[in-house]
Amino acid sequence: CRCVREKPISVELLPFFHHSDSTFRTFSGNAMPTDGDTMLTAATFFDLSSYQHPHLFVDGAYVWTALNGLKRYMNDFAYTLPEDPLLPQGVPLAAPVVLHGGKVLAADGLQIHYGDTTRGGLIVRDSGEILAGATVIMAGAVLLGREIEFGGGVLVESGAMIKAPAIIGEMSEVRQGAYLRGYCLAGRRCILGHATEVKHSIFLDDAKAGHFAYLGDSILGAGTNLGAGTKFANLRFLPGNVTLRINGERIDTGRRKLGAILGDNTQTGCNSVTNPGTILGRNCVLMPNTTAPSGYHSEGTLISPKSY
C-alpha cells in the first residue's frame, strides 16, 4: 500500500507533554542507537512487562527491528492447532467448531453465549458445564495452514480468512471479513476487525483495529485504537529503503517496507492515513481524515489538518 501526503497538516504537542530535542545521525537499519540516542527503542513506546512475546523486541535496538525478527520467531513457534476433519484447509468451515483441551469439538449440542469476547464474555457450555477457555470458530471462516495458534476464549467470525502463520492471543476477536495474510501476531484481547487486512504485523495486548483498516509491516502498542478506515501505507513510490528524517538527520531503517508504529494508548481517527515509516509515541492522536507525515512524532503529539 503506497501513500503520499495530499493536504497540509499541523503537528502539535498535547499540552501535558514536552517535545524531546534528542538528535540522531545516519544509521543502518539493524544498528543499535548510540549513547543517548534512545528515543526510538521499544522502551520509549511500549510497556512489555506483561506481554507474552517480549523477546521480539531487543533491548536497546530500534523499535522497528522487531519486524525483522518476526518471521523467524513465528517460524520457530510451537503451534498446537490439531489436525481434524472438522478443520479443513483452504475452504470455508461447513459448521462451527470449538477448540478446547487440545481437541476440536463440533458445536452442535454445545451452548454458546456470544458476549463481549475481549471481556471474557464468550462462554461455551456442554450440558451446562462451562468449558473454560474455549475458542469458537464460526461456520464460513477459512484457515489456510496448520501454523495457526489460538489462545483461550478467541472468537473467529464467519467470513474471516487466516493464513498461516498466525498467533491470536486469548480473548481476541477476528471479525467477519478480516483477512490475515500471514505473519500476524496478536496479543491478548485484540480486535482484528471487519474488512481489515493485516500482514506481517504485531499487536500488543488490547490493540484494536475494528473496521476497514489496512496494516502492513506495522506494530500497534497496548491499548491502541484505530478509527474506521485507517490505512498504514508501507511502501514508498521511490526505490530504496524507508528512511526517517529526524532533526535534520536521516536514519535508514533497512526495511523496504515499513508501515506505522504506534506507542501504547495512541489513537487514530476515522479515514486517517500514515505514510511509510510513521512512528508515533505513546498517547498520540491522529485526527480523522488526516495524513500523518513519515518520521518520529514524540509522546503526546496531536496531528491534525491545519483547517481544524
Region annotations inferred by a language model:
Residues D76-T80, D84-G90, E149-M161, V198, ...:
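Short, charge-rich amphipathic segments
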